């Protein structure tokens, strides 16, 4: 097994983000905690808008719910448990699925695509609600300020700069978020001094009493849940920052968040008459700091939006390699490892965020749409984590206890958030359903296509391939002929590949290369095996590609060839005398076998529907040569029919052959 260098691994990194230290902790603040760090902008405001009476028991109960939600959900489930379920250092629901894929259970991939779909769907709301809430703070200074146009302008800039990368400004995100969290804690402490009894909220008794007695407890829980919506990002960003950096940073972040929530609660109890008509986050700010706080809130919202957009690109890149999503054009706008840009997704997200802003108009209405989808993501993560714990030898009792406890907690939150369905939750659920349908159809169609690929033993054709190479009467097609072999069995070859070489048009070449691409369960694996099947004629190359690595077959094959030439295992100098005497290497040509589905051939209506939807969905992706990273000037695409349980229509003869009618006059 020999290691390859990908385009990604060649990109330099200036520091090791996973190394524990001040720099690593600072970078972690900028990458991981943007979403959860901006939740104080809208959580308390959402609680006050539930219609519950504003008194000490309500506020203490709501704050107690926030504190213990952050503890049970974020600290225990994600920081203490999920961060340990890493896939070679990578985290997130798709990385977790890759660990469990070998179980070959249908439900494992169903849970994964449900979780990924709802995570992506809720991501449309985050930039909209965070930026809108931050800009709404300006209304306390100038009530007639046009919030929506300013918000749309900021959102437009955020998405526009994605094509250029964020390397230059990204370095300052950590410093900015450090200042942001210090601001949260400082103003929280100042406000707490005016009502110290607010510290009683640490007692879970007040949460229990509120949930037991309040008629609005469902609505309050739906608002409380917004404080932990960013918890999934902690797990997804594990590979960027490392478990220790996230764990240590979270201790600081959680402290600052709780201080700010307590400060807002203290302000509400001392201004109960007017609290419901303003945003407590901005109200606890000293008047002299208000404009500065609005600027900081806007900056934090931009950081949160940037982190979410980058996270969306990463999730969909993983989904492409796991065959959950059609392959799209991916760009690398900077020299930072792992920073990618997907133009189609960037445009789709921008349109989605703009529509959300125009549809809901203000953050109070957006709160109703926020949280429902991410609750489902958390439930899916809980179930997958439970399965993972079982595969690691954790006792069945502990596994059932973990799944039972968190399914109960998240089930209650889900029920609470369902109360917001008609008020706006339908929006993210609709987006999530569209994404789920896309992923489900893609997975099923890929399985159908693979099932109907016919494979033949390759060694049965060694002789005829050698004969074609030696047959001078056949025009030479290329010096080096490269095929992508889709047969999954060892020692087998796609029969359409053989048909292309032998039957369709005999293709004579000096060297034949069969490329097998195996997408493995580890994130950054990039290795190959090469087997010489016919000396100096036929080679079988298997590339093992991690689910975070972008396929670049031309680049990787060049490295394989260079290795073989350097070790004198193959001579690729052109066979043409005029080129050979000058040491010119032979040319390469790639043949892509593209199977075209013809629906009239299928007798299975379900398969017919899936394949028709697959054909429709594939239009948003790129073609096979681009998806494989091939130089399109050297590629020939041969289209063949994909036969699926085709109908057999017997043709009936209506005329007799001449021998049967000797006396017929023509």
PLM regions: where:
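The structured alpha-helical core of multi-pass membrane proteins
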Residues: 2-666
